[in-house]
Design a protein with these regions (language model features):
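N-terminal low-complexity segments enriched in Gly/Pro/Tyr/Ser
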Residues: 1-173
Length: 173
């Protein structure tokens, strides 16, 4: 899908980095400012004087990500707009890509990252495996069996193997 194509370049990023990047993408002007600031080889002490969103400030610790976002500003802007308007759909698309990568053996534990899959339940419709619980309701002499769906699905998380290290995976989406 178009949404999967949009998130493919970042879907396999560690969760914490991905979260910062998604929020930062909603501030494309600040991405440009941060990229320019980083190009000057700044004194990091001057970072606190910047009036940027916290996500942008934290991403300056990962200059290659800021550079990538700046180099692909149309993509960054589209990602930010989509994340603001459809955050659940963005996260679902990321999970679909992670599932494909896990199933194909591409996404797995490495010395740099720990990949975990766990089943979760949610009371909102989405793709996944459905389990139902029945509730009977009488209406006009007929009994209607309502079955609210409780979705069971797998969520794949990616964490750094070393908590003090940010790993930016390199892959061709």
């Amino acid at each position: 899908t178009d949404l999967e194509s949009l998130v493919a370049p970042i879907a396999l990023y560690p969760d914490q980095l991905l979260a910062e990047l998604l929020v930062a993408s909603t501030y494309p002007l600040e991405v440009v400012q941060a990229a320019r600031w980083l190009e000057t080889k700044p004194d990091l002490a001057t970072l606190s004087s910047k009036d940027w969103d916290a996500s942008i400030m934290r991403l300056t610790a990962v200059p290659q990500v800021v550079k990538m976002m700046n180099d692909h500003l149309d993509w960054t802007t589209q990602l930010g707009d989509t994340f603001l308007s459809k955050p659940s759909e963005v996260m679902d698309a990321i999970q679909k890509l992670r599932k494909r990568a896990t199933d194909s053996g591409f996404l797995k534990d490495t010395p740099e990252q720990k990949v975990t899959a766990k089943a979760v339940s949610a009371e909102q419709p989405a793709e996944g495996t459905w389990a139902t619980e029945g509730t009977s309701v009488e209406s006009g002499g007929a009994t209607i069996k309502a079955t609210p769906a409780v979705m069971k699905r797998e969520v794949i998380t990616i964490e750094p193997a070393k908590t003090d290290t940010v790993y930016v995976p390199q892959y061709n989406p």
